[in-house]
Amino acid sequence: TVDKNGTVRARTDSGECTITATLADGTESLTCRVRVGDITVPIFATAGLRGDRTTLADAAALKGATPDSILLDAGDSLHGTESASLTGGMDMLSAFSAAGYDLHAMALTDFAYGTTRLVSDANMGSGPSLASNLLNNEGTAVFYRSTSWSRNRVTNGRYTVVERAGYKIGFFVLNDPAQAAVISASNGEFITARDWNDTAAEQITALQNAGCDAILAIVSTAPAGDWQKALLSQGVTAIIDGATAENG
């Protein structure tokens, strides 16, 4: 119905309906979709694939069959098979793009061919690559201002916001500084990691300021101790632990 003020109202118990409003003279119309009832945003994650692409078709099908879903990789997935090693990780990033991944978290093991090479390869991804507390030798986030193959996406390298079904879902990625200190790439590029808690606090604040309805921390390389409790107490809605087999 349309009242005298031009307010359009529709009623449905659940599901969705389409409303089209047209001016009396027929010169202009607007169509919008209205959804009623509980709306969820499913998040699917892979991790620890180590160069194995056999499950990516299933992941793509799962996302395609699930409205409003988000698909991501939580790290440790670029290297491990002969074909993946031949391309230094580019093979997997291209496969992620083809499967419709929304973002990629980078674990320490994903830097096996060096920071410079990985940043270049990350351009093959359709979604942003993130490593919030890993820094390059200029002291900025490794993936700061990295772009996608289509050149229409720029990331700050620390966090990203994905919008689904009217919700803003924020993501950031953490790696253990203690492990980063003992891992270096074969070409001599060393990985520098910022403090875990300081980085988490900064990303949570930034995502809250961005108006996120939920904030997810992706932990690609976990530290010792009760880190889950620490993250949740800072305002994280949920944690994706890339080191656990359940995400594979």
Where would I find each of the regions flagged by the language model?
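Extracytoplasmic soluble-region selector
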Residues: 1-38
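Acidic, metal/ion-coordinating pockets
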Residues: 18, 35-248
